[in-house]
Amino acid sequence: MINPRRSTAAVLVSLLALAGCTSTSDSAATGASAAAPTSTGPVTVTSCQRTIALDAPPQRIFAVFHPAIELAHALGAGDRLVGTAFLDNQILPEYAAAQATVPYNDDYPSKERLYSLTPDFVLSAFNDAFTPDVLGSQNDLAAQNINSYVFGEWCPAAEPGEGKPLQLKKATFETTYTDITQVGVLLGAPDRAADIIARMKAVVDDTRTRVRGADTSVTVAVGTLRDDGTISVQGGSGITQEIIEIAGGTNAYADIATRQASVSVEDFVRRDPDVIVLAPCCGKDMTVADGQKEVDKYTAAPALADVTAVRDKRFIVVPFPGLFSGIRNADTAAQIARALHPDRF
């Protein structure tokens, strides 16, 4: 819900453009969170250089991180979730009731807690979950007869299964579509997966059509101003890069090869972005309304006063999960496009 106390016109424009964030997502909506698998035979997929073979859809799923949790619900597996961890923001409204019945952890559960839930499958949106000191590597889990899948955006570059924090590959919307397809196959919901992808592609196509011919030279920085004075920005290898391109903008940090990087205030001033995208995080009750705190940090920083986006108060606040591979990506691109090019919508 938009905070009525917000008075900065540019912020209000941005948030009004994103008003759909708290309602049912057209590209993600697929009906109820629980649905019987439509495919029940043996399946095999390959992800992150790892082959995953299942004789039947998993019945006891533990989902880690927001994009994985929402994907499980979107695929109709909400009633098969035995536990979840790490929601970044409020879950999409259509899955709220189902999620409320699922055990939830704000942090990683201990291995003992995980094993006590007797999962037969762990679905994670980030590779960090599969490290020996967290949930265990994918090989560790396999030794306990627990299959697992990590989203392709966060595949380790080598040594599949060991969960080591290695350099990651470039992610695109095709990476997201592949994950949705493969997880849909594994969970026995290939038709629902295809429907999600079709809806996302329709939103992307509509957005591209609307911004075609618009001025795409506007520079956009996805950045979080930290308490230590540095700024965490999104580089050119994550899904954010294509989100900005689809929205009709130019990533101010596209030349940075990594997904995220810490930059100095001086570098941020030198790049002088026209628009700053903010994504408040992290907690299961957070919404775009919490973005006002991030806006206030920028506008209160004297060293950033002359940055075009700060001076003109051009901030776009989006839900954090939309900036990482998952079912919200298409809507996030459309929401940013509406704020960058309101005359096209």
For the regions a protein language model found, what residue spans apply to each?
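Bacterial Sec-exported substrate-binding components of ABC uptake systems
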Residues: 2-69, 185-223, 342-345
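Short helix-initiation/N-cap motifs at beta->coil->alpha
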Residues: 47-49, 102-112, 132, 256-265
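A short, structured surface patch at a secondary-structure boundary
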Residues: 60, 64-130, 252, 287
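Solvent-exposed loop/turn segments at secondary-structure junctions
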Residues: 67-70, 87-90, 121-122, 127-131, ...
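Alpha-helical, coiled-coil/dimerization segments enriched in small aliphatic residues
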Residues: 87-91, 99-100, 233-260, 320
